[in-house]
Amino acid sequence: MSGNRKRNTSEPREDDEDDYSTKRKRNNEAVNRTRQKKRQEENDTAEKVDELKKENETLERKVEQLQKELSFLKEMFMAYAKNDGNDGPPPPPPPSSSAV
């Protein structure tokens, strides 16, 4: 008798399909979250690059301005040393540093 019993295979197959569907859905959601996170990180990195480029440009302008000021002060010092500190006319004031 037990050899003639037919097993109902439709139920386990439906369960397997439901499990597969559920796993696929969860995997797709995880993939979408990962891709979204990656896009956000790329955007954040691009913004940081832009910010650092602007900061670098500002610092380069400041370095240029300070180099000009240093050159001017060296010239003043050399003129003063050449004059041996004799009472001569006072040196001109340094250029304004309000450009930065």
From Swiss-Prot:
Record keywords, A-Z: Coiled coil, DNA-binding, Immunity, Innate immunity, Nucleus, Transcription, Transcription regulation
Compositionally biased tracts (Basic and acidic residues): 39-60
Alphabetical GO biological process terms: defense response to Gram-negative bacterium; DNA-templated transcription; innate immune response; regulation of lipid metabolic process; regulation of transcription by RNA polymerase II
Coiled-coil intervals, chain numbering: 24-83
Region annotated Leucine-zipper, chain positions: 52-73
Pfam families to which the protein is assigned, alphabetical: bZIP_2
Phenotype of null mutants: RNAi-mediated knockdown reduces overall fat content. Decreases survival upon infection with P.aeruginosa. Reduces induction of expression of infection response gene, irg-1, in response to P.aeruginosa. The decrease in survival upon P.aeruginosa infection on a zip-11 mutant background is abolished by RNAi-mediated knockdown of cebp-2.
PROSITE patterns xrefs: BZIP (PS50217)
Feature: compositional bias, Pro residues: 88-100
Record-level Gene Ontology MF annotations: DNA-binding transcription factor activity, RNA polymerase II-specific; RNA polymerase II cis-regulatory region sequence-specific DNA binding
Sequence segments annotated as region (Basic motif): 23-48
Cystine connections: none
GO cellular component: nucleus
UniProt function note: Transcription factor that binds to the promoter and the enhancer regions of target genes. Regulates expression of genes involved in fat metabolism, including ech-1.1 and fat-5. Has a protective role in response to infection by the Gram-negative bacterium P.aeruginosa. Required for the activation of infection response gene irg-1 following P.aeruginosa infection. Required to prevent P.aeruginosa ToxA-mediated lethality. May also function in concert with transcription factor zip-11 to mediate immune responses, independently of the pmk-1/p38 MAPK pathway.
Family statement drawn from the similarity comment of this UniProt entry: Belongs to the bZIP family. C/EBP subfamily.
PANTHER family: CCAAT/ENHANCER BINDING PROTEIN, CCAAT_ENHANCER-BINDING PROTEIN GAMMA
Record note on quaternary structure: Interacts with transcription factor zip-11.
Protein name: CCAAT/enhancer-binding protein homolog 2
Organism: Caenorhabditis elegans
